[in-house]
């Protein structure tokens, strides 16, 4: 069999989903946890048009908020915070101990910090003149830590 490396800068959504599925299968097998679930909320106007969404997942006692968006015309009205609060509560209800999110400095790191997230890392110059900030929030303190501080 001959394999070829092919340049593809236009993967389809189905191809990206297939890659993510393979990552999940590998990671789940590696740690013996197959409890991954998508987690998402959408806000729609009275015509059914989506004006905001929060999407991510829970898996192996953690959660990641991968995407948060509110239409520009609806920003500043508390919709992003409502989406974030719903996402956090659902993750907590599923037993996630921690939740993390990445936010550029020109997006919403302040909103996450007001909601109790703490900065864990900041990548300056990502992109040039800006930073990519990783934030994390502890949802459930672990009781089986053998004296190791698990809070963030």
Descriptions of predicted regions:
Residues 1-11, 141-152:
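Conserved N-terminal entry element of GNAT/NAT acetyltransferase domains
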Residues 100-102, 118-136:
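Conserved catalytic-core motifs of GNAT/GCN5-like acyltransferases
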Residues 36-54:
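Conserved beta-hairpin
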Residues 74, 78-86:
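Conserved acetyl-CoA pyrophosphate-binding loop and the N-cap/start of the following alpha-helix
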């Amino acid at each position: 069999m001959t394999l070829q490396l092919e340049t593809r800068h236009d993967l389809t959504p189905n191809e990206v989903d297939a890659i993510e599925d393979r990552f999940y299968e590998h990671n789940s097998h590696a740690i013996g946890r197959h409890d991954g679930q998508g987690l998402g909320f959408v806000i729609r106007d009275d015509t059914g048009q989506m004006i905001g969404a929060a999407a991510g997942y829970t898996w192996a006692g953690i959660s990641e908020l991968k995407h948060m968006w509110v239409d520009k015309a609806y920003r500043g009205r508390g919709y992003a915070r409502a989406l974030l609060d719903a996402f956090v509560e659902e993750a907590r209800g599923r037993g996630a101990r921690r939740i993390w999110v990445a936010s550029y400095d020109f997006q919403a790191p302040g909103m996450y910090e007001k909601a109790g997230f703490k900065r864990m890392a900041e990548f300056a110059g990502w992109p040039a003149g800006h930073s990519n900030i990783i934030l994390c929030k502890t949802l459930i303190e672990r009781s089986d830590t053998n004296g190791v501080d698990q809070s963030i």
